[in-house]
C-alpha cells in the first residue's frame, strides 16, 4: 500500500506546486476574469506597489513584476494585432470634422447598402471636403485612381487597374442622403 501511496502523493504535490506557480505568472486581471465567482477586475500591480513590495520582501516584488511585464507584452500584441487586422475602432475614433478639407482620389463610390451604389464622376484634379454638396457630372472616369468608400466603416481602399478612361454614371437608387457620424447634418448628393 505504501508503494501505491508514495507515487500518488508525489503526483499530487507536483500538480499543486505547478498550479501555484502558474497562478503567480498570470496577470491578476486575467485570473479575475477566469474565475466565475468574481464580478470585479483586480487591478494590475503598478510600479509604485512593486517598489513598496520590494522594500518589504524581494520574492514578492519578483513575482509581482512578472505579471506586469506579461500584461504589458499582451497589450502590445493586442495593439499590433488590431492594427494589422484593420479593425474599425481606431478609424471611427479619428473622424474628421466638416470644416477640414480632405484630399480624396476621385471618383467615389458611396455604398449605403449592399447592391446600391452611386459612382460620382467628378473632374479629377479636385479636392473633396467632408460635408460638401457633390453633384453627378458626366465626365471622364479614370479607373486607375478609383477609390471605394465603404460607408459602414468609412474605409478608403484604393483600386489599382489599367488606366482606361470611360464616361459613366451608375445609379441604382434615387439621390443618396449621406451624413458623417461626427456631424449630424445630412448631405444630399443630387443629380
UniProtKB/Swiss-Prot annotation:
Name of a matching Pfam family: Retinin_C
Q: How is it modified after translation?
A: Phosphorylated.
Q: Which cysteines bridge via disulfide bonds?
A: none
Report biased composition (Low complexity) as residue ranges.
Answer: 55-69, 78-88
Q: Name one GO molecular function term.
A: structural constituent of eye lens
- Mind telling me which GO cellular component terms the entry cites? extracellular space
Write down the InterPro entries for this protein, in alphabetical order: Retinin_C
Protein name stated in the entry: Retinin
* Protein species of origin: Drosophila melanogaster
